[in-house]
From Swiss-Prot:
This is Putative protein RDUR. One of its GO terms (biological process) is innate immune response. Could play a role in innate immunity against viruses. It comes from Homo sapiens. Residues 1-12 have a biased composition (Basic and acidic residues). Residues 1-20 are annotated as: Disordered. Keywords: Immunity, Innate immunity.
Length: 95
């Protein structure tokens, strides 16, 4: 499992707080952008082709469990783009 989270220096007009690249145990790769939005964090994940074909419920469960946030998030999948919104303070990668 290869996990990385890179915080970026932010200009006052920039809401981007970092990006994530991960390869899961089954070899699926994804990249995510992390943006602050008021008191919430919007996670945008670009799924690999193999992950796209795995099915909505698997993708949602697998990615959410990888981020170790379960209850306080809303998930949405549109094509190969996966989004979820959660309170910023509960996100383990940007505390």
């Amino acid at each position: 499992m290869n996990n990385s989270f890179n915080k970026e220096d932010r200009m006052s007009s920039d809401t981007m707080v970092g990006s994530c690249d991960r390869q899961t145990k089954n070899g699926a790769k994804w990249h995510g952008g992390v943006s602050s939005l008021l008191d919430f964090t919007l996670i945008y994940i670009q799924l690999s082709t193999s992950f796209q074909n795995a099915g909505h419920s698997f993708k949602k469960q697998h990615i959410c469990s990888d981020f170790e946030v379960m209850d306080e998030l809303s998930c949405a999948v549109y094509g190969n783009k996966f989004y979820y919104l959660l309170p910023t303070l509960t996100h383990p990668s940007i505390q």
